[in-house]
Amino acid sequence: MAFFGTPSTSTSTGTTSGQSQQVKQQIQEQISQELAVANATELVNKITENCFEKCVEQPQNGLNPQQDACVNQCLEKYMRSWNVVSKSYITRIQQSSN
């Protein structure tokens, strides 16, 4: 029961609880987005490091056709692997949230 225009405890608590859930969800979404950016950055760094080491023995002004083909194949391999891992990860998250 409210006296003199002050909200009752149950209404106030319900609103606070709803706001807390909304804030919690926003924080979770922000963390998820930050993790996605960090993962993408890590992927690019790993691809660059590993494919360069594998394909370019002596750096020059540019890549020769053999090095270019090697880098492209390496990149495609990493991207295929990334897609498989990402799909599996998303599936697991969806299963655990249900």
Curated annotation (Swiss-Prot):
It is found in: Mitochondrion inner membrane. Signal peptide: none annotated. Keywords: Chaperone, Disulfide bond, Membrane, Metal-binding, Mitochondrion, Mitochondrion inner membrane, Protein transport, Translocation, Transport, Zinc. Its main location: mitochondrion. GO terms for cellular component: mitochondrial inner membrane; mitochondrial intermembrane space protein transporter complex. A motif (Twin CX3C motif) lies at residues 51-74. Disulfide bonds join 51-74, 55-70. GO terms for biological process: protein insertion into mitochondrial inner membrane. It is a peripheral membrane protein. It comes from the Eukaryota. Residues 1-24 are annotated as: Disordered. One of its GO terms (molecular function) is protein transporter activity. Heterohexamer; composed of 3 copies of TIM8 and 3 copies of TIM13, named soluble 70 kDa complex. Associates with the TIM22 complex, whose core is composed of TIM22 and TIM54. Interacts with the transmembrane regions of multi-pass transmembrane proteins in transit. Mitochondrial intermembrane chaperone that participates in the import and insertion of some multi-pass transmembrane proteins into the mitochondrial inner membrane. Also required for the transfer of beta-barrel precursors from the TOM complex to the sorting and assembly machinery (SAM complex) of the outer membrane. Acts as a chaperone-like protein that protects the hydrophobic precursors from aggregation and guide them through the mitochondrial intermembrane space. Belongs to the small Tim family. The twin CX3C motif contains 4 conserved Cys residues that form 2 disulfide bonds in the mitochondrial intermembrane space. However, during the transit of TIM13 from cytoplasm into mitochondrion, the Cys residues probably coordinate zinc, thereby preventing folding and allowing its transfer across mitochondrial outer membrane. This is Mitochondrial import inner membrane translocase subunit TIM13. The gene is TIM13.
